[in-house]
Design a protein with these regions (language model features):
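N-terminal phosphate-binding caps/lids of nucleotide- and nucleic-acid-binding domains
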Residues: 1-169
Length: 169
């Protein structure tokens, strides 16, 4: 299947006016959402064009390959595999080597059941694990994929569906 989005907000004049103005923020949001979806679905081919300029042309690959395609070749040698399987959750993915930590926090991704989510407590836990390994003010890279029984996670906490709530049982 192929999906193409053109003339976004064509029928919504107030949104169209926003786009016709300074659209750099919107472009950044579209790119960010594209990256999240592409990182969750490495087996899918994706292409992103903005104003007819090719931004991404992603071929099907594995998770590591997709991370390299999105973030850049520099990250390839800095990814450490993570794999934990319990009766409650399966955790897979990659964390960055401590020496590759950066001041910017643009390489931190959490996914649950194929969906990107944001969790301040989980982010703090991951950063705390690096506490003595990285300079203060730096952030480690991480790409963590959780698989949980769908009955144990609620994705309807926030309209953007980026906040999730996990069941305690």
């Amino acid at each position: 299947a192929q999906f193409m989005v053109r003339n976004l907000f064509y029928n919504v004049p107030s949104r169209r006016k926003f786009i016709d103005g300074d659209n750099s923020r919107l472009s950044a949001q579209i790119k960010s959402e594209f990256q999240r979806v592409a990182l969750c679905n490495p087996e899918v081919e994706f292409e992103l064009r903005q104003n007819d300029a090719l931004v991404y042309a992603l071929r099907p690959t594995n998770r590591r390959g997709r991370i390299v395609d999105i973030i850049g070749k520099h990250i390839k040698q800095n990814l450490l595999d993570v794999e934990v399987d319990t009766s409650v959750v399966r955790i897979e993915g990659f964390v960055g080597r401590p020496e590759a930590a950066k001041k910017r926090n643009n390489e931190q991704y959490l996914f649950v059941n194929g969906r990107y989510f944001n969790s301040i407590p989980m982010q703090r836990t991951i950063v705390r694990a690096y506490e003595r390994l990285i300079p203060e003010g730096c952030m480690p890279s991480y790409f963590i994929y959780l698989t949980v029984d769908p009955d144990r996670v609620d994705v309807n906490v926030h309209p953007q569906k980026t906040t999730v709530k996990f069941a305690d049982h």
